[in-house]
């Protein structure tokens, strides 16, 4: 006789049978790399100087490896559509599953809403000084945001048979940029423009311990995160129990090398000069190729390729954030409207429309007035708290979860899960209590706590209403 856990898993698998399954191992690997690797973090890490390698290695040891290990374990144990929603629901209870999915959904909504602003900025950089007005133009940002959300929403409705190629092309564009970035110091050495280049030089940090922990938590939960997101699409993967874990194993070392060597390249050319934290990659490309007549053109191409990556990465957010309401609808915690599939493409079309409308409304509203802009900035700052909550819950499953799930977790997996949970808590703390200059640390902390509390109170209210409606 099947256990309660097995019946719950079978119910999700039965629901997932209606979904198309276009994702293979190749697609998953590229999506993992696309989603995790960004361009801004190599600039942030380069500000640490030669100590960047120390921080990268520490973050890899205490967060990146634990994250990969736990995601592999849970995706093998529960290869279910909805990913971490199902893991927390079956590992703890429905409330935990809903709240962790709610926090992840809030994070994605924030990222999608910001996408238009980032793309507008990148396009203005690619065009040159004549387009410097674009990021400051509310109408321009609003129009580009509308085009982004509309285009990605259409692709998402069409399904991952199309969407996976958006993600694959974005990953390829990023590979081209990072290959150029990593190769640049070698070219500089060959031409005599760089005297030395030591990409793997290990130096201990000289800044305060408090500052070190802050940077470490940011690199961990900010840069080296995202493996759990692809698992949301398990029901649309041909062999999820096998391939999601494999994709993490294959992508992990590639991602680590891209971050470490990319940071080394930025440091080699920018050095002690001010680092452009928005566009450290094009800044480095310009400096590395300044002796070539085509330096400006190459940098512009690099910016456009990174813009392609941003669009593709935002597409992953749209896809994942539309699946979370769908699976909550399966459990009748949200109206069944969110779970209805497109008759041809078998995608949650209503959920996609809801995500698109919500993010577009936020993106446009954030351009209207200073009060709304400040509120959105607070939500953006609180996004790290949302992600910290997601990761703390995920790491807790092999430690404190249901016996049927944690029974297969080895001692070493539980130890690394404890490390990951501790880092997640530190990321929450350093988001609430920043070491950067703010007018009032207490006021900043109170605002972040208030935003996080209100956001999660809304999530709790939605859960309670959904459960009451289901019982009635």
Give the location of each predicted region.
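Membrane-interface "cap" regions at the ends of multi-pass membrane proteins
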Residues: 1-58, 64-69, 78-81, 460, ...
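Helix-loop-helix connectors at the membrane interface of multi-pass transporters/channels
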Residues: 4, 15, 86-89, 116-143, ...
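Helix-loop-helix junctions that connect adjacent transmembrane segments
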Residues: 19, 53-54, 131-140, 168-300, ...
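Select transmembrane alpha-helical segments in multipass membrane proteins
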Residues: 21-32, 93-106, 144-148, 206-220, ...
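Hydrophobic transmembrane alpha-helices that form the core helical bundles
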Residues: 46-48, 65-149, 154-157, 307-324, ...
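A generic transmembrane alpha-helix motif of multi-pass inner-membrane proteins
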Residues: 56, 377, 382-387, 411-472
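TM-loop-TM module centered on a large, flexible mid-protein loop between adjacent transmembrane helices
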Residues: 86-88, 93, 125-130, 247-315, ...
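Membrane-interface loop-to-helix entry segments
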Residues: 140-194, 225, 248-253, 384-393, ...
């Amino acid at each position: 006789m099947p256990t309660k856990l097995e019946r719950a898993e079978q119910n999700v698998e039965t629901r997932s049978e209606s979904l198309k399954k276009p994702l293979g191992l190749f697609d998953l690997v590229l999506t993992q790399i696309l989603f995790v690797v960004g361009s801004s973090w190599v600039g942030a890490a380069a500000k640490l100087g030669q100590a960047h390698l120390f921080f990268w290695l520490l973050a890899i040891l205490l967060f990146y490896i634990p994250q990969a290990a736990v995601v592999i374990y849970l995706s093998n144990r529960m290869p279910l559509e909805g990913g971490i929603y199902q893991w927390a629901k079956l590992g703890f209870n429905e409330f935990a599953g809903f709240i962790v999915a709610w926090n992840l959904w809030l994070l994605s909504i924030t990222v999608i809403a910001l996408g238009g602003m980032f793309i507008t900025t990148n396009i203005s950089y690619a065009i040159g000084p004549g387009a410097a007005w674009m990021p400051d133009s509310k109408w321009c940002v609003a129009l580009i945001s509308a085009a982004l959300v509309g285009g990605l929403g259409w692709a998402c409705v069409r399904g991952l048979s199309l969407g996976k190629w958006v993600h694959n092309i974005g990953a390829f564009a990023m590979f081209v940029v990072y290959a150029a970035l990593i190769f640049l110091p070698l070219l500089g050495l060959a031409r005599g423009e760089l005297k030395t280049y030591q990409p793997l030089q290990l130096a201990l940090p000289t800044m305060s311990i408090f500052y070190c922990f802050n940077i470490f938590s940011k690199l961990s939960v900010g840069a080296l995160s995202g493996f759990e997101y692809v698992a949301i699409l398990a029901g649309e993967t041909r062999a999820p129990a096998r391939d999601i874990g494999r994709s993490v194993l294959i992508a992990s070392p590639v991602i680590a090398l891209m971050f470490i060597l990319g940071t080394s390249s930025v440091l080699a050319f920018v050095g002690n000069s001010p680092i452009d934290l928005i566009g450290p990659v094009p800044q480095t490309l310009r400096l590395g190729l300044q002796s070539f007549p085509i330096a400006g053109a190459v940098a512009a191409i690099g910016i456009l390729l990174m813009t392609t990556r941003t669009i593709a990465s935002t597409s992953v957010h749209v896809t994942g954030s539309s699946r979370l309401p769908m699976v909550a609808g399966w459990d009748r915690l949200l109206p069944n409207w969110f779970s209805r599939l497109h008759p041809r493409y078998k995608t949650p079309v209503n959920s996609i429309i809801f995500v698109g409308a919500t993010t577009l409304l936020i993106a446009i509203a954030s351009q209207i007035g200073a009060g709304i802009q400040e509120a959105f900035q607070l939500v953006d700052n609180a996004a790290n708290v949302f992600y910290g909550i997601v990761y703390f819950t995920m790491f807790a499953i092999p430690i404190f979860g249901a016996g049927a799930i944690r029974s297969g977790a080895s001692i070493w997996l539980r130890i690394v899960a404890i490390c990951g949970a501790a880092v997640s808590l530190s990321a929450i703390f350093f988001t609430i209590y920043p070491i950067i200059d703010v007018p009032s640390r207490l006021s900043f902390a109170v605002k972040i706590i208030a935003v996080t509390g209100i956001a999660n109170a809304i999530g709790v209210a939605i859960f309670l209403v959904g459960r009451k409606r289901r019982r009635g």
